[in-house]
Amino acid sequence: MAKKSLIEREKKRQKLEQKYHLIRRSPKKQISKAQSLSEKWELHGKLQSLPRNSAPTRLRRRCFSTGRPRGNCRDFGLSGHILREMVHEGLLPGATRSSW
């Protein structure tokens, strides 16, 4: 189980990312279209003035039940060992154990 402070920090980052998503998107598009170097520097300055935690690269996908940051399955939002336990218990509809 992850510390609650880490989980709350991640939630705060998600809120910031959603809040600044549109604001961050427009300068990034303009940077790719900018022709002069001075324009690019100016647009980079605008991006750097935004909060650091509003960047989508700072988000980390965590397990829904335990908060574990590694070994997550995107389809279910669970880490590998929790996913395995829930499939064995039949708690995930449509998920079956593999056998060949």
UniProtKB/Swiss-Prot annotation:
Biological-process GO terms, alphabetical: translation
Keywords annotated in UniProt: Chloroplast, Plastid, Ribonucleoprotein, Ribosomal protein, RNA-binding, rRNA-binding
Location, primary (coarse class): plastid
Recorded GO CC terms: chloroplast; small ribosomal subunit
Transmembrane intervals: none
UniProt-listed PROSITE patterns: RIBOSOMAL_S14
Pfam families: Ribosomal_S14 (PF00253)
Places the protein is found: Plastid, Chloroplast
Any GO molecular function: rRNA binding
Subunit structure: Part of the 30S ribosomal subunit.
Function according to Swiss-Prot or TrEMBL: Binds 16S rRNA, required for the assembly of 30S particles.
Protein family per UniProt: Belongs to the universal ribosomal protein uS14 family.
Listed name of the protein: Small ribosomal subunit protein uS14c
Organism from which the protein derives: Cicer arietinum
Lineage, highest ranks first: Eukaryota, Viridiplantae, Streptophyta, Embryophyta, Tracheophyta
